[in-house]
Amino acid sequence: MALEKSLALLPLLVLVLLVLGWVQPSLGKESRAKKFQRQHMDSDGSLSSNPTYCNNMMRRRNMTQGWCKPVNTFVHEPLVDVQDVCFQENVTCKNGQANCYKSSSSMHITDCRLTSGSRYPNCAYQTSQKERHIIVACEGNPYVPVHFDASVEDST
């Protein structure tokens, strides 16, 4: 009798273990869209000419853990405006993929470049503010930016 009940619960136990095995790896893992936002969005960031902006932001956004990320760009526009770029001019990505899009208008950005001679753990960045078109790679449902590909000057 007890054996029959145990055997009846076996398929349920197997199902629970399969679901846990499928769900568990994705728990706590940052999505590509969230990583893009962490690494590139600073909608509330001031456009002051603070020379330590990049040093502070790169550290705060976890891009100097274990190494110094050599180049990064922060976009100072509302997230929805950056997400809208995914429905603007389609361009080829630097890696040859076809899922990149160029913003139809210039956006306020800050470029951060690792200064020569800078070594981990003392990552030091040069901060330069610009107004440029951005190019982002998009994917997913909803279709959102997942990679910052480039920034380009106005071609007029």
Swiss-Prot record:
Substrates-to-products reaction catalysed: an [RNA] containing cytidine + H2O = an [RNA]-3'-cytidine-3'-phosphate + a 5'-hydroxy-ribonucleotide-3'-[RNA]; an [RNA] containing uridine + H2O = an [RNA]-3'-uridine-3'-phosphate + a 5'-hydroxy-ribonucleotide-3'-[RNA]
Keyword annotations of the record: Disulfide bond, Endonuclease, Glycoprotein, Hydrolase, Lyase, Nuclease, Secreted, Signal
Glycan attachment sites: 62, 90
Top EC class, one word: lyase
Active-site residues, as the UniProt record annotates them: 40, 147
Binding-site residues, substrate: 35, 38, 69-73, 94, 113
Signal peptide from the UniProt entry: 1-28
One Gene Ontology term from the biological process aspect of the record: defense response to Gram-positive bacterium
EC number(s) from the headed UniProt entry: 4.6.1.18
Disulfide bonds: 54-112, 68-123, 86-138, 93-100
Cell compartment(s), UniProt: Secreted
GO cellular component, one term: extracellular region
Gene Ontology molecular function: any one: lyase activity
Gene3D superfamilies found in the cross-reference section: Ribonuclease A-like domain
Principal place of residence: secreted
InterPro entries registered for this protein in UniProt: RNaseA (IPR001427), RNaseA-like_dom_sf (IPR036816), RNaseA_AS (IPR023411), RNaseA_domain (IPR023412)
Similarity field: Belongs to the pancreatic ribonuclease family.
Oligomeric form and interacting partners: Monomer. Interacts with and forms tight 1:1 complexes with RNH1. Dimerization of two such complexes may occur. Interaction with RNH1 inhibits this protein.
Task performed by this protein: Endonuclease that catalyzes the cleavage of RNA on the 3' side of pyrimidine nucleotides. Acts on single-stranded and double-stranded RNA.
Protein's name according to its UniProt entry: Ribonuclease pancreatic
